[in-house]
Amino acid sequence: MRASRFFISTLKEAPSDAEIVSHKLMMRAGMIKKIGSGIYTYMPMGLRVIRKVEAIIREEMNNAHAIELLMPLVQPAELWQETGRWDKMGAELMRVKDRHGREFAIQPTSEEVVTDVVRTEIKSYRQLPINFYHIQTKFRDERRPRFGLMRGREFTMKDAYSFDRDIDGLKKSYQIMFDAYVKIFNRFGLQFRAVAADNGAIGGSGSHEFHVIADTGEDALVYCPNSDYAANMEAAEALPLSSARAAPTQALTKTATPGKAKCEDVAALLNLPLAQTVKSIVLTVEKEDKGVTSKQVWLLLLRGDHELNEVKAAKIPGIAGYRFASEAEIIEWFDTPPGYLGPINTKKPVNLVVDRTVANMHDFVCGANEVDFHFTGVNWGRDLPEAQVFDIRNVVEGDPSPDGKGTLAIQRGIEVGHVFQLGTAYSESMKATYLDENGKPQLIQMGCYGIGVTRILGAAIEQNFDDKGIIWPTALAPFEVVLCPMGYDRSEGVKAETDKLYEALQAAGVDVILDDRGERPGAMFADWELIGVPHRIVIGDRGLKEGKLEYQGRRDAAATPVALEEMLGFVQAKLAN
């Protein structure tokens, strides 16, 4: 490719609405162009990166014996109504009507359509297992699109769906896809971590997320440096911080804490460690039976320095669909405003749940259900009946690892892939069955596996950039090598040697671009450093007189002189690494 025949459009400054590094650099490098909230045109430079991401994914999916198809962007409402997701998805699901008044969804995911394909095409156990995948545009009507390709409304994903006879088959298919994902992300040249995760709204049980490691990542990844244990914050198990509860040493005492409504302030006033305080979180669950709505109030207790894990809380039996109680509801049940709540002497009965760590505490401090007062010296069994105990908190750095092999560490990551064991969550609601060896219908076991194709671009940049611009891993770069001739239009020697090297690199299969635009050296170098091409070769009269060219990797502090006749092999060796 010659730069004069390609479209290159760079900016010195990022648009004012670009918030994070990847968004700013992609806009400045001319890779994307915003045309609406969360909607972008992929410009030629950016599209080249997308195509390289897709090519790696497609090759590894094919190697894993997944079969490519292409499902529609616009999908009939009836399919989504079968699974109930037409209503469950809420406003994020874009709904449209055609001229006949028929309703359709602009798909954010394709479980319904692929299940419909399988239930009509797969009849016998002999046709299983099978795995279909596609790479398709999606649309999710995000409430607040931001961060460029990291959280847009229109985006591209690879979705694969496996179908098996039984759970054992599903687990095998799941492992095959998990291994394929590891190969894909290794080929991308990115630092990543696979972590155990919660299935969330998509349903089923058993899943892993794949995260690109980045300090700017939205997600907290929990792992043990001494083992293979890794989970996202939602799924990471928080073990009790003591093996047994100590005996009481203090009497229950109602203590004045004027104006101290936060655990931190109470601990400071009483000259106690924050870890000796307990915070109260009030949740409300409304249930309807025969047209009558009843309300249940739940009181969850956490250590003062811990945070509620809302995903874990939702798994407490009977609490599904909870919301945080309003101040009016809190006063109705506790006769006191937030800040002084506790489990002793509530105005109305509540369902009490305590975190594992709280269950092992003694002589702790909690609200007294009276403004400006807390109880000290609170102990289970004596002052309070034993309560339901669940793991309901976020882990913190230094917690014991659930596998017993050390303590936990936390790093930030950007989710770019997710694999799920769906089981029969969709085949049951859509009646997707096969006939077994005895001619009896059996529900198909299903798995689904997604990679955010366009999100990979943003995540890769968040991990790989400097003050000059993007630093693409070679496998993802729009071009592997850029040739920067000094005076290409003025020096016959420079032009001849540049053209010769360009043709040799092309013949060797190197993805090379020759910058023949006639730009000044400073501007030319700045463009390619911003765009992030990983390998640069400079050809100039001065070097040619000595029979040398200059090579500089995008991460290199200085250029390396290389003999003219050795440059092709030198570059090939760099690319091989």
Swiss-Prot record:
A molecular function (GO) term: proline-tRNA ligase activity
GO cellular component, one term: cytosol
Keywords: Aminoacyl-tRNA synthetase, ATP-binding, Cytoplasm, Ligase, Nucleotide-binding, Protein biosynthesis
Reaction catalyzed: tRNA(Pro) + L-proline + ATP = L-prolyl-tRNA(Pro) + AMP + diphosphate
EC number: 6.1.1.15
Major localization class: cytoplasm
Superkingdom, natural source: Bacteria
Subcellular location: Cytoplasm
Any single Pfam family the record assigns to this protein: HGTP_anticodon
Enzyme class, broadest EC rank: ligase
GO BP annotation list: prolyl-tRNA aminoacylation
Quaternary structure, from the entry: Homodimer.
Family of the protein in this entry: Belongs to the class-II aminoacyl-tRNA synthetase family. ProS type 1 subfamily.
Comment, domains: Consists of three domains: the N-terminal catalytic domain, the editing domain and the C-terminal anticodon-binding domain.
Role noted for this protein: Catalyzes the attachment of proline to tRNA(Pro) in a two-step reaction: proline is first activated by ATP to form Pro-AMP and then transferred to the acceptor end of tRNA(Pro). As ProRS can inadvertently accommodate and process non-cognate amino acids such as alanine and cysteine, to avoid such errors it has two additional distinct editing activities against alanine. One activity is designated as 'pretransfer' editing and involves the tRNA(Pro)-independent hydrolysis of activated Ala-AMP.
Protein name: Proline--tRNA ligase
Organism: Janthinobacterium sp. (strain Marseille)
Gene name tied to this protein: proS
